[in-house]
Amino acid sequence: MTKILLNTASTVLTRLWKLSLLGLVFAVAAATLVSSRIPTTLEEVKSSGKLIVISRNGPTTYYEGPAGHTGFEYVMAKAFAKHLGVDLEVREIEDLGEMLDKVGTKAGHLAASGLTVTEKRARKVLFAEPYLQVTQQLIYRSGESKPETIEDLYGKRVMVISNSSHSERLKELQREYRDLAWEEQHDVDMLDLLEMVHNGKIDYTIVDSNAYQINRPVYPKATVAFDISEPQDLAWAFPQQKDASLYNEAQKFFKDIKQTGAIDDAMETFYGHLGEIDYSGAILFAHRLQSRLPKWETHLKAAAEKNDLDWQLLAALSYQESHWNPKAKSPTGVRGFMMLTLNTAKEVGVKNRLNAEQSIYGGARYFKSLHGRLPERIKEPDRTWLALAAYNIGLGHLEDARILTEHFGGNPDKWADVKQQLPLLAKRKYYKFTKHGYARGWEAVDYVQNIRNFHTIIAWNEIENQRLQQLAQNENHVSDYAQFSPTVTEAVKSISGTSSL
């Protein structure tokens, strides 16, 4: 009996041991499965601490501005990275076809490059919530016969960027208009094509409405003929795969920024009116000499004297920046009377950028610093004009333009030569070889010219202010220009680009 009991106990213990061992095996296996589970893309991004975005360096995507990297796509991608709690890394791929092929690979988690949602592209990638609608616009040269229909393109030289939504649209139109022909180039950008139309090298091109709006001041003869498409969505591109974790998070992100209005602020910053100076703006400046300048004249003179500057030049610079508004604020981050970035304010010791006196003294110190950091061999007045350009576009971009100037046989120390090359910083075939990349170089040229003209008017105003007041009261004058002396009249005309009344 005892033997039977011992055998039974042994059998039970053996079974319990086997069950325990089996349980341990299952536990280890389960732990192994959990530890070996492939993380989602979203988890991978968060654990690595970095979001990699594919884009193109350019005016509607991202570029290096005076305050650092900027551009609509860059700002949105930066906000998404912040939403995820990670850093942003932008990687450039210039060819649009290659860009879409590499979405979701090691090249990048997503593509944010002003991509138009098309049927063909939607078969390759997964598009997120659209953030903007654009139309494709046919561009022709002002002064030439304006095309009214697609048939008007027959026999003409039409050029577009290869692998673009514009080439897709032309292929769609060709099904109905069989005689439609065009050229595709992969080594040109939108600004190149606008220049070709402007100079009459090609008859027509196609650009997106948002891109045209940003760049129309550069080549004013390149004009819209008509919309060649219905409104189309722009969106970010994600890979088509089962793991949609990052895509879903992006959908939540866009929903949030639309509700908070953050996306509207970005739209206004990058796609709002460019602020070209026209006749009315020039006249407004002339009147603000009387209404605003006197309030700040004492501070401007003191700051200029302390930094060995021309106070009238400092006044002209500050008007160009803020219109003498101490509370001026830009969505890009510059603020105050001298529109200082946060980093620049810290550099020159400004604690409150909205304090006009601090801003004036800080702006004067910053301009003096830029003036002094230029090569010693540069003489006046070129030194001042180049320093003004640096205040607008940054020393890095200015140096890029000076290198280009020397490359093309010009004098990098002469403003007259450098200003000819500054617009090249907006053209891919040039800026892709520069250290600091894309910049809206033509704006720096206009910026300096405006300040020089403002300076002329302020200098004249200092001498003949009383006479101007008397002339302004004369009811017999037939135009606003006639309220001022010939000197002021010509300066105002120069600013506004008006040659006759």
UniProtKB/Swiss-Prot annotation:
SMART domains from the UniProt entry: PBPb
Residue ranges, annotated region (LT domain): 275-501
Pfam family, one: SBP_bac_3
Active site: 321
Classification via InterPro entries: Lysozyme-like_dom_sf, MltF, Solute-binding_3/MltF_N, Transglycosylase_SLT_dom_1
One Gene Ontology molecular-function label: peptidoglycan lytic transglycosylase activity
Keywords, sorted A to Z: Cell outer membrane, Cell wall biogenesis/degradation, Lyase, Membrane, Signal
Disulfide-bond pairs as recorded: none
GO cellular component, one term: cell outer membrane
Protein EC: 4.2.2.n1
Membrane-topology descriptor: Peripheral membrane protein
Database matches in CDD domains: MLTF-like, PBP2_YfhD_N
Subcellular compartments: Cell outer membrane
Principal place of residence: membrane
Chain positions covered by the region annotation Non-LT domain: 30-274
Signal peptide segment: 1-29
Catalytic activity: Exolytic cleavage of the (1->4)-beta-glycosidic linkage between N-acetylmuramic acid (MurNAc) and N-acetylglucosamine (GlcNAc) residues in peptidoglycan, from either the reducing or the non-reducing ends of the peptidoglycan chains, with concomitant formation of a 1,6-anhydrobond in the MurNAc residue
Function: Murein-degrading enzyme that degrades murein glycan strands and insoluble, high-molecular weight murein sacculi, with the concomitant formation of a 1,6-anhydromuramoyl product. Lytic transglycosylases (LTs) play an integral role in the metabolism of the peptidoglycan (PG) sacculus. Their lytic action creates space within the PG sacculus to allow for its expansion as well as for the insertion of various structures such as secretion systems and flagella.
Family, per entry: In the N-terminal section; belongs to the bacterial solute-binding protein 3 family.
Domain comment in the entry: The N-terminal domain does not have lytic activity and probably modulates enzymatic activity. The C-terminal domain is the catalytic active domain.
Protein name, per record: Membrane-bound lytic murein transglycosylase F
Organism in which the protein naturally occurs: Saccharophagus degradans (strain 2-40 / ATCC 43961 / DSM 17024)
Gene (name only): mltF
